[in-house]
Amino acid sequence: MVLCFQDPDNIYSPKKTKKDDGERVITKQKSFLGLSILDISNPSSTTLSEDLSISLAGSDLHVFTQAELRVITQSFSSSNFLGEGGFGPVHKGFIDDKLRPGLKAQPVAVKLLDLDGLQGHREFMTEVMCLGKLKHPNLVKLIGYCCEEAHRLLVYEFMPRGSLESQLFRRCSLPLPWTTRLNIAYEAAKGLQFLHEAEKPIIYRDFKASNILLDSDYTAKLSDFGLAKDGPQGDDTHVSTRVMGTQGYAAPEYIMTGHLTAKSDVYSFGVVLLELLTGRKSVDIARSSRKETLVEWARPMLNDARKLGRIMDPRLEDQYSETGARKAATLAYQCLRYRPKTRPDISTVVSVLQDIKDYKDDIPIGIFTYTVPTKPRREVKETSLQNFDKPRRETKVTSLQNFDKTRREVKDTSLQNFDKTRREVKETSLQNFDKTRREVKETSLQNFDKPRNVSTTDNHQKFRSPAHTARNHRITLRNGYNSPMRNEAGGERY
């Protein structure tokens, strides 16, 4: 998604010229493609088609009519809908070899300008002029366009694999192998190098994963040049323009100042390279705040070989060159430096990626495989939940039935055993109590009767008081008997 971060007046101020008659002031600034912004900004200009024909003289672009494009896309059928970007909806079509002489039969992608979208007539013209004159294996091929009344359409070669974004982040897609990822990074850098080193350098300004398209062989090609700008000319170090781009990819100095340079594209390339390494989006609001922005989360670990494994895409399943991964991480770190002057230029990036791509010595031996469900994830999830819930309900009912049955059986058995035991205990207790009662009664009667046979004298002797003992002692002394007390004193009486 393209976002306009800011639009300060002091950043974008085209030259103003007055007409001789002083009737009105018009803004006029030469574009990198030869047409004036006055012409580009006026979609109802009657000379627009003529201007395009003159500017694109010698190019092989075809000018289609609205009727022809309806035939190609089957009236823009919903079954041919491919997606939608900042420019507008994109439909798949097929050009028959009978449609026009010299135009071979081929599948195409038709992009329709949404007049209420984020991009408009200016971006349409920039796209046509740029891709109409620039040809490179790593730039998507523009076959033709339609500029009829208010209709603005672009016809491209069809890219069967879609965008890098869909290949990396779509849930049902197969993971890209390590070598394929390096090739994509290398080819995308080659396309960017072609723009930066052109006779009139061009700054891409919107380098991101969704703008890198892949053909059937996974060859990477840059697309969507609507935001492209002329590079600085002469002694100029940058281009001042309103800030437009995609959140998570735009260079920090460009966001803050509106100063655009080729190093701004290098920063954006570093973000895409980081996405290839980690398998994560540049901005993912589903993650925690610390991990939401990819650059802020991963940059501290790019220069640490011990921590590099933490950020590598787990879907690679360790099927990658550790040496190559370290070099690629170092390159991404250099591209993401805060100061533009310290970032490498794109030619250096291409050279480093060439070396990394050719280095395959320590890639683990084996075929890269990744098992995915045959059904779409949503269907698999729903089926799994249904299957999971069905046994769960059956198990629950069966368990309740078995539990209730067992509970009744246990309850009946327990009551029977309890009642039986209770009766046995009661009978045994009564028998033991009666037996013990009789024994206690008999023993008590015997013991009660026995002490009554003891003599009274013995009892008196056994249980006499001190006064009684002293009286008996006096009687004994008087009668002349030896006294125990006297004996204790050591004497006898004769």
From Swiss-Prot:
PROSITE patterns: PROTEIN_KINASE_DOM (PS50011), PROTEIN_KINASE_ST (PS00108). The keyword Lipoprotein applies. Disruption phenotype: No visible phenotype under normal growth conditions. Mutant plants exhibit enhanced disease resistance after inoculation with virulent Pseudomonas syringae, elevated basal-level expression of the PR1 defense marker gene, enhanced reactive oxygen species (ROS) burst in response to perception of bacterial microbial patterns, and accelerated flagellin-induced activation of MAP kinases. GO terms for biological process: defense response; negative regulation of immune response; protein phosphorylation. Keywords: ATP-binding, Cell membrane, Kinase, Lipoprotein, Membrane, Nucleotide-binding, Palmitate, Phosphoprotein, Plant defense, Serine/threonine-protein kinase, Transferase. The modification Phosphothreonine is found at T65, T241, T246, T323, T383, T395, T398, T406, T413, T421, T428, T443, T456. The modification Phosphoserine is found at S210, S240, S321, S384, S429, S444, S455. Residues 462-471 have a biased composition (Basic residues). InterPro entries: Kinase-like_dom_sf, Plant_Ser_Thr_Prot_Kinase, Prot_kinase_dom, Ser-Thr/Tyr_kinase_cat_dom, Ser/Thr_kinase_AS. Its main location: membrane. It holds the Pfam family PK_Tyr_Ser-Thr. It is found in: Cell membrane. ATP binds at L82, G83, E84, G85, G86, F87, G88, P89, V90, K111. It catalyses: L-seryl-[protein] + ATP = O-phospho-L-seryl-[protein] + ADP + H(+); L-threonyl-[protein] + ATP = O-phospho-L-threonyl-[protein] + ADP + H(+). Interacts with RBHOD. Interaction is disrupted by flagellin-induced immune signaling. This is Serine/threonine-protein kinase PBL13. It comes from Arabidopsis thaliana. The lineage of its organism: Eukaryota, Viridiplantae, Streptophyta, Embryophyta, Tracheophyta.
